[in-house]
Design a protein with these regions (language model features):
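Alpha-helical interface subdomain recognition
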Residues: 1-130
Length: 130
């Protein structure tokens, strides 16, 4: 999931650098730059939670709570990043020629493949009650 989110960020960033509106690159517009900045922050948080979960497992510690959190957050961050990158692309984001259209599909399916968000939330809630 973090890889999908990272791909969305990189794709959105490149498009914002390449595409111009009103004589300026899209990245120079505060709303676009803000979207990219928040994507980077959220991706870093999801990545670090994933690393922490893996560290717990590597050190023979219980990690079901952390793994569930990483799955839930990773899938949500991937979807948000793909959606933001699509918004940066504007109408072009829906064209199959643009990579972001595929990334959006990949991000959407993560909640299904990695366990539905509701199931992950239940796993987390049950573990918190232990």
């Amino acid at each position: 999931a973090v890889g999908v989110a990272q791909s969305a960020l990189e794709t959105g960033m490149q498009y914002a650098l390449d595409r111009t509106q009103f004589g300026k690159a899209l990245i120079e517009f505060p709303r676009v730059a803000g979207k990219l900045a928040m994507m980077a922050v959220e991706i870093m948080i999801a990545r670090q939670l994933t690393y922490f979960s893996a560290w717990q497992k590597d050190n023979d510690k219980r990690c079901d709570l952390e793994a569930g959190m990483a799955k839930l957050l990773g899938a949500r961050v991937a979807w948000a990043a793909a959606d933001n990158a699509l918004q940066i692309h504007g109408g072009n984001g829906f064209a199959l020629e643009y990579r972001i259209s595929r990334i959006l599909c990949d991000a959407r399916i993560l909640n299904i493949f990695e366990g539905a968000a509701e199931i992950q939330a239940q796993v987390i809630a049950r573990r918190l009650l232990d």
